[in-house]
């Protein structure tokens, strides 16, 4: 069995008020749910998904992220799909939609964005949403 690498499917929930439905769906598919809080906003996604959150950020989140002390944490809820199989991703998206689970932004963890912080991912998702909105408005 040497050389086999098992990657566990995970979901990162940020700013999602009621995760009960997501947790229920994930449990049925053996997907782990990680609830990211404000102290993780400046953590790299790779660290969050692998449980390697810096103790400095846990203890001193206000000194590391001054925007959080100004109550400027984004209002958007974010769901990040980490290493889900195509089958599980499709099923999860279908179930979330059919159960009317409200999530503002969704993303898939990629080799590129896994080195980003949650803040950087949020900024990029905001840019993409604005770009789509502008394109739709022009058409």
Language-model segment annotations:
Residues 25, 53-66, 72-75, 85:
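Long, folded non-catalytic interaction modules
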Residues 33-54, 64-67, 99-113, 117-118:
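A cross-kingdom feature marking solvent-exposed beta-strand/loop segments within repeated
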Residues 67-99:
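Mid-chain, well-packed structural core segment of small domains
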Residues 10, 20-24, 28, 89-136:
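Helix-rich interaction surfaces within compact, conserved domain-sized segments
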Residues 67, 136-138:
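Extended alpha-helical surfaces
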Residues 2-59:
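N-terminal, charge-rich interaction modules
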């Amino acid at each position: 069995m040497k050389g086999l690498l098992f990657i566990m499917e995970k979901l990162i929930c940020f700013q999602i008020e009621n995760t009960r439905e997501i947790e229920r769906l994930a449990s049925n598919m053996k997907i782990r749910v990680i609830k990211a809080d404000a102290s993780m906003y400046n953590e790299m996604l790779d660290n969050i998904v692998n449980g390697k959150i810096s103790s400095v950020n846990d203890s001193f989140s206000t000194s590391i992220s001054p925007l959080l002390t100004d109550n400027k944490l984004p209002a958007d809820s974010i769901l990040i799909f980490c290493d889900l199989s195509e089958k599980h991703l499709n099923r999860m998206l279908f179930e979330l939609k059919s159960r009317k689970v409200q999530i503002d932004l969704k993303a898939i963890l990629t080799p590129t964005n896994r080195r980003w912080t949650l803040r950087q991912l949020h900024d990029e998702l905001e840019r993409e949403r604005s770009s789509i909105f502008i394109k739709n408005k022009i058409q």
